[in-house]
Design a protein with these regions (language model features):
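Active-site glycine- and acidic-residue-rich loops that bind
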Residues: 135-140, 198-207, 488-495, 610-611
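Thiamine diphosphate
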Residues: 2-129, 151, 160-291, 295, 305-511, 516, ...
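Short, glycine-rich nucleotide/cofactor-binding loops
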Residues: 133-138, 330-332
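Short glycine/serine/threonine-rich phosphate/pyrophosphate-binding segments
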Residues: 32-33, 106-110, 137-145, 166-167, ...
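A short alpha/beta connector and helix-capping loop motif
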Residues: 139-162, 434, 438, 443, ...
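Terminal amphipathic helices with adjacent charged low-complexity linkers/tails
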Residues: 280, 284-324
């Protein structure tokens, strides 16, 4: 406890001297944190800490030197290589999963981590602990994680460290009644323990009871520990702006660094001189470590892109470029997705499919009497029947938890394939995708990775979908570093790209256009169980000499129809059509080669025209291929509005064949 506090104090001094760049302390939380660390088995149990958990991770084995290396942002920082702020703990060896700044986002990931324990080691008694302040319990992910953990009796210990303040907002303005543990009364399977988190002895008893409950696989447990916060939230905050002198005096009186030494002396377990010698030794060691760490080298220039993706498995390489071995009759795109999932589940027991309505039937006793659901589009039909309910199961309607759970499972080495039912409903999971899943490898300096494949149905051209079943917006996700984004236009590509997504080691957003699921024109015989298509390799679906159309998804077929019309009018001027297939990364060489041949380019996509995916391609063509162009770069996209319900509205809003023809004729007239 004293070591944790002295590191806080030393960092505060360094920040005031401008020798480090940020500081947040765990002062006042030391007793409950050390108790939690003593109840766990380092390197066996798993921990999702938050930024105040300095004493917890120290008790698990993180060294003071590691902490100071992170504070100065050194290349030798074992948690992140200088990429994360201080107090963002990470240690693969100690099973301390890399943390992030968004409060509460760790909850749903811890559900997946604890779920993985039950799946990978059913006979083991390992547990997962997730920690937060009381303010984070206002986040939706907290409630989603509790719901999931209680439903499945997941061995997960929630540690809520309640110091009474979420920066400047007191508990009574965060939680109805001011007590999170009181609100949770009635959650089935959940053990609730409320404890004075500044009392080490009581804290140890509480943590031991909670951990033992989870080890016995009786369900999740929650410890609500009342702490104190004798320092400001961080050095960016001044608590005197919202705390009275009396508030601050009361908190100081409950400081565990005063209470615990006094208790040791009163119980005859130590004398004041012995305690002082220990504290003096800690102070001396802290000073020595600080002086040494301040000389540490910063991250190397040129290392910023390192570990953005896996550096051992490259899905853009020739290893992922195989030839099809066609089998059977032509199949629809949705059938190919279903078969590819089944083949990969058979090949690799780590592959697990879950989401809303993906299972055949949640009530297993009914499986012999019903046909089964298997997804609203039948993409997962039969997978539960073939592989069991542990490998294909339904979840609550909670998109953040679906993605976060998958992230936690992937950290443990599983290959989760969650489904988001409609692209229009992916937004509750946005923080989990952008701030967590996509940057886990980068922010942990390759310490952790999360190769999740998120399947999502996307797009319009199905009458009646309207605002919430017909939108696109893929450009939002192609703007996220570390995330692969794929969108096949036909059954054959869906098979090869989905298999690559599952076998690669990066997170992938796999976009499945709803209109293309059962079209007759994009069917293909099955390409075999080892057919792979590398990411970033486009397909020239039609060669031409006078105009290049760069497109993907549902616009591929519409581009073919437009080209047919144009070439009927002038057979000597033909249109080349490039299906990108993969949006991040994309095949720039294919675009460059085609544009240098045709000297004209039209970029077409279904999403809104303004700030759409085509804007980046058009800008790069204009920037790098200007000398090859005989006409401006043109774009076709949807109107800058929402997709309407009535078919006439939808047809007006979404790009049609006539829109492609009009722009193509304008370019060909130059």
């Amino acid at each position: 406890m004293h070591t944790s506090r002295r590191i806080d104090d030393r960092e505060i001094l360094l920040k005031r001297q401008s020798r480090i760049f940020f500081q947040v302390s765990g002062a006042g939380h030391e007793a409950i944190q050390v108790a939690a660390g003593m109840a766990l088995r380092p390197g066996f149990d798993w921990v999702y800490p938050y930024y105040r958990d300095r004493a917890l991770v120290l008790s698990l084995g993180v060294s003071p030197e590691d902490m100071f290396l992170q504070a100065v942002g050194a290349a030798a920082d074992r948690a992140s290589g200088g990429r994360q702020m201080p107090s963002h703990w990470s240690s693969p060896e100690l099973h301390i999963v890399t943390g992030s700044s968004p409060t509460g986002s760790q909850f749903v990931q811890s559900v997946g981590c604890a779920h993985a324990s039950s799946y990978l080691h059913p006979a083991s008694d390992e547990v997962t602990l997730v920690s937060s302040g009381e303010g984070a319990t206002s986040e939706g992910e907290f409630w989603e994680s509790l719901n999931a953990a209680c439903l499945d009796k997941i061995p997960l210990v929630f540690l809520v460290q309640d110091n009474g303040w979420a920066i400047s907002v007191p508990s009574e303005r965060q939680t109805p009644g001011g007590s999170i543990s009181a609100l949770l009364e009635g959650f089935p399977q959940l053990l609730r323990i409320e404890v004075d988190g500044t009392d080490f002895v009581a804290s140890y008893a509480a943590m031991r009871e909670a951990v033992d409950y989870c080890r016995a696989r009786r369900g999740p447990a929650l410890v609500h520990a009342h702490c104190t916060r004798p320092y400001s939230h961080s050095l960016s905050d001044d608590e005197r702006l919202y705390k009275t002198d009396m508030d601050r005096a009361r908190e100081a009186a409950r400081d565990p660094l005063l209470r615990y030494p006094a208790w040791l002396v009163s119980e005859g377990l130590a004398d004041e001189r012995a305690l002082q010698r220990i504290m003096d030794e800690v102070d001396r060691e802290t000073q020595e470590i600080t002086e040494r760490v301040l000389r540490a080298e910063p991250p190397e220039r040129g290392s910023a892109l390192k570990y953005l993706y896996s550096e051992t498995v490259d899905p853009t390489s020739s290893e992922f470029d195989t030839q099809p071995v066609f089998l059977g009759d032509p199949r629809t795109m949705v059938d190919e997705i279903n078969l590819t999932l089944a083949e990969e589940m058979k090949r690799d027991s780590r592959v697990i499919v879950f989401g809303e309505d993906v299972a055949d039937c949640s009530r297993e006793q009914n499986l012999l009497e019903v046909k089964g659901k298997g997804g609203v589009f039948k993409a997962t039909a039969g997978l539960q029947m073939k592989f069991g309910s542990k490998r294909c199961f339904n979840t609550p309607i909670a998109e953040a938890c679906i993605v976060g759970r998958a992230t936690g499972m992937a950290v443990r080495g599983l290959k989760p394939i969650p489904e988001i039912q409609f692209f229009d409903y992916i937004w509750p999971a946005m923080m989990q995708i952008r701030d967590e899943l996509a940057n886990i490898r980068w922010r942990s300096n390759n310490g952790f990775s999360a190769p999740v494949v998120i399947r999502v149905a996307i797009g319009g051209y199905l009458n009646g979908g309207a605002i919430y079943h017909s939108q696109c917006g893929e450009v939002v996700f192609t703007h996220i570093p570390g995330l692969r984004v794929v969108m096949p236009s036909n059954a054959l590509d869906a098979c090869g790209l989905l298999r690559t997504a599952i076998r690669c080691e990066d997170p992938v957003l796999f976009l499945e256009h709803k209109r293309l699921y059962r079209e007759p024109y994009n069917r293909s015989p099955h390409a075999g169980p080892d057919y792979l298509i590398p990411f970033g390799k486009a397909k020239v679906v039609k060669p031409g000499n006078a105009l290049t159309i760069v497109t993907y998804g549902a616009l591929v077929q519409k581009s073919l129809q437009a080209a047919m019309y144009l070439e009927q009018r002038d057979p000597n001027r033909t249109v080349e059509i490039i299906d990108l297939r993969c949006l991040s990364p994309y095949d720039w060489e294919a675009i460059r080669t085609s544009v240098e041949k045709t000297s004209r380019v039209l970029v077409a996509h279904e999403d809104c025209l303004s700030w759409g995916y085509g804007a980046e391609l058009a800008a790069r063509v204009a920037d790098e291929l200007f000398g090859s162009l005989d006409a401006p770069v043109a774009r076709v996209g949807a109107l800058d509005t929402w997709v309407g319900y009535h078919p006439q509205l939808e047809n007006e809003i979404l790009p049609q064949v006539d829109d492609l023809i009009k722009q193509a004729e304008r370019l060909l007239a130059y």
